[in-house]
Amino acid sequence: MKRPMIGYTLSLIAGIGMGKIFGTEYVFLILCGVFFCGLFYWGKKSLRIAGLCFLVGLSLPFLRDPLWDDGFNGRYVKVEGRVERVFQKGENQKLLLQGEKMNGAAVREKFYIRGVTTEYVPGEKISVEGFFRSPRAQKNPYLFDEKNYIRSLGAAGSIQAENISSLECVHWKLKGHLYVLSRLREFSRTTENLLQRSMLGYGEGDFDALREIGLAHILAASGFHLGLLSFFFLHFLLLSGLGKRQASIWTVLVLWLYGAFIGFPPGLLRSLVMFTLLIFSVPFRKRYDALDALCIAAWISLFINPWWLFQPAFLLSYGGTACLLILYPALQAWGVHKILALPLSVALGLLPWQLHFFGQWNPWAILANILLLPFFMVAFIGAFLYLIFGFTPLLGSILKFFVEQSSGIFLILSEDAAELPGRISTAAWNLPLIIVYFILLYLLFSPATRQWQVKKSWRKFLVTGTLFLCAAPCFQILYPPFVLRHIAIGQGDAALIQGSYNLMVDTGGEKYGYDSGEGILFPLLRKLGISTIHGLYITHLDADHCENALELVKQFHVKGVFLPPQKEYTPWFQNFLLLCQKKKVPVYDLTSGEIHNWGNLQIQNEFADLSGNDGSLMQRIQMDKISILFTGDAGFETEKQLMDRFAPVKVLKVGHHGSKYSTGEDFLRKISPKYGILSCGENNRYGHPHQEVIEKLQERKIKIYRTDTQGCITVKSCFGLRVSTHEEETKEIFIPWLLGAVFVFVGLWTGKRVKDEDWI
């Protein structure tokens, strides 16, 4: 039997991904139409079906988008409904509410509730008053995307709770959660939190040590937990005297009830579908195929909510399971013992996703899954037995003892293992790199590759060669010799220069109720694999340009700070200088006309002998034929004094966030830029950028880029000068790699098929 289901599922996934990335762009849709017309005319039947699956996937993000339009955005609303899921306990609890009424009218949408200060449990009926907000897409690469997350919950938007009241409700889910929580409170606080997280999917405690050693999957109900429960219930019912078929059916019913009880998270739903297919394959006399069952589970999950595809829970669950099914027999065939082959195959499947989402991987995770999980398994099964039999004094005491001891040993050993050296930290992997990783993994381990005869070995070289030929020009796109990112930091300035050295010009930092350092700047630097800043330039000491510099020096290795001469010794600035002294970070006072060479990158520093914003540092950055001018918050007077010192540039960082008191006509005429970049916050209180500045730039046909509407603006040396928005950069690095993946996919599809027993 052939395995077309794998190809059809990959086609569906590719379609969903393309629909999300490219949306309804006409050029993309036309190219898809031309490609699939050719495919349906010349392609084989299996390729036609794969093309149809791709088109289905392409439409799913639009057909299953739960978000409302902006009609309610910013409005004060009152919603009544039932709590469906709880995401966090404590002072800042978050809920998923299944709405029933909104402002008195019946609704069926779900809402993500923030700022909940009272603890609630699933099944509880509540009334929420607050401001409705449509989620915003992430404007910087690699960071948490609130819009996709809200979509993955199936919610129409979020509500910042101002007032919450409980309503009378008698619901089976509420009663069940209250019973489980009351019984778990009989354990110690740490054990209670661990069991709440693993059984119910919410609870207090961070358990950072488990994340450090790759055991974070036990903190949310997943396939691992379902496997333990199925093993326990099936054998318990068999020992009770039920026949195998009856015991299997009752086990399936109990597991689906448990899934409904905690809200069917993606990993648990996958396991439920696969286990159900396994159980019912026997009476229907159908051969169970684990990979096909995995594909069926993926189809069901993605039809329920295609936005799950972009969430860690879905990718880690399906990626780990797929690699377990494919690599486990291959590793055993290579002579790896089955005890080691099991966690190793899962680790290989999870590796790229862990590097993508977390930027780090711990090799000790393989041994941790072998040595530590048995202790957790005892605690988990013991806790379920305690929920059922804990009311009997003797048996309850015995079960409680074993649960406490095994969970305590598990957590102590986890904390010790987290202290071991060897953790690998790197720049976050992007999606094209992950695709290539899995293709190469397939080429290395698949039975199709192993069974190709020598006379057909040209296929392997053709496929692999095509891949790398397509990938070669992308290397410069992904890792160009010069990249300058104008980070979407809000109302402020922050620019990161990557080349031979890592440099920063300003850090942003004015709070406006949100910490842009902890929320944007520092996570982005870590995702980019940056731990050292070789030079930090501060144009002037306004908070929106430099306030994050204090924490930057604390959390990263900064080798030098460069300041303009105009300084006001505020308490913040004095603390900053003391911290630099404590961390032995050199602080340099710049002089006008000073030239800095960072490899093949040259920075010309200039400033006027003026105070306030007009004392801002202005910099001309030159690398090969690429030239960029930073102006800080300099106004007309500074521009007039300094413009003769600068040669024309290709890119202008427009002064003072687009204020009408900056960027004069004579200045623009002198430096003659082709691109203008405006760094400002969305709907900021200053009205930046001012319309007068926009009109000046448009009159001179300067292409305008804005961080408030277009997100992070990237300038890079990619076959010359390239300026792109966050959305454009995502697309341009994806297309060539996609072409390579298509060639490889077609080559593998048309290659020699293999028998099922070669896989499993």
Where on the chain are the PLM-derived regions?
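Active-site environment of divalent metal-dependent phosphoester hydrolases
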Residues: 226, 266-268, 512, 541-546, ...
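Active-site metal-binding motif and surrounding structural segment of the metallo-beta-lactamase
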Residues: 500-503, 509-563, 644-659, 672-677
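Aromatic-rich juxtamembrane segments at the membrane interface
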Residues: 152-274, 279-280, 535, 560, ...
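Cap/insert and terminal regions of metallo-dependent hydrolase folds
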Residues: 641-711
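N-terminal leader/targeting segments
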Residues: 1-71, 148, 152, 158-163, ...
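Internal transmembrane alpha-helical bundles of multi-pass membrane proteins
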Residues: 9-13, 264-452, 634, 640-652, ...
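Core dinuclear metal-dependent hydrolase active-site scaffold
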Residues: 306-309, 415-535, 581-648, 709-738, ...
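Membrane-interface helix/helix-cap signal primarily in integral membrane proteins
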Residues: 57-217, 519-528, 532, 566-568, ...
